[in-house]
UniProtKB/Swiss-Prot annotation:
Membrane topology according to the record: Lipid-anchor; GPI-anchor
Gene giving rise to this polypeptide: Ly6f
Signal peptide extent: 1-26
Lipidated residues (GPI-anchor amidated glycine): G112
Alphabetical list of Pfam families matching this protein: UPAR_LY6
Coiled-coil regions listed: none
PROSITE patterns found in the cross-reference section: LY6_UPAR (PS00983)
Disulfide bonds: C29-C53, C32-C41, C46-C74, C78-C98, C99-C104
Domain of life: Eukaryota
Natural source organism: Mus musculus
Alphabetically ordered keywords of this record: Cell membrane, Disulfide bond, Glycoprotein, GPI-anchor, Lipoprotein, Membrane, Signal
InterPro entries in the record: CD59_antigen_CS (IPR018363), LY6_UPA_recep-like (IPR016054), LY6H/LY6L_nAChR_modulators (IPR051445), Snake_toxin-like_sf (IPR045860)
GO CC annotation terms, alphabetical: plasma membrane; side of membrane
Record's protein name: Lymphocyte antigen 6F
Amino acid sequence: MDSCHTTKSCVLILLVVLLCAERAQGLECYNCLGVSLGIACKSITCPYPDAVCISQQVELIVDSQRRKVKNKLCFPFCPANLENMEILGTTVNVNTSCCKEDLCNAPFSTGGSTWTMTRVLLLNLGSVFLQTLL
């Protein structure tokens, strides 16, 4: 009976370690600044402990000519949207969205990171394994 209890404890500790592993690695976000809307961005690991991934659509208006670009980055906090801000004769509109999951600032849904899907799978397998030990 003591051996069974030890096995359960080891499995539980392993599951907790695996579930916490992703945060120890840091949040991953796509990162690019001022690129055209169709251009892909590379991913980076954020250096900030409580980071958010940011996706921005920026519209620049100069003499009635419009140009749209995107920014994707990680940041320590979520900045506010900017509407009709005048900078040196240029009107700037920035639509910002923030999220806290790995690679969540993609232009389309990625279905989650590999680590997130692995954690869900391990959690399900671990719970089944614990039920069989009980």
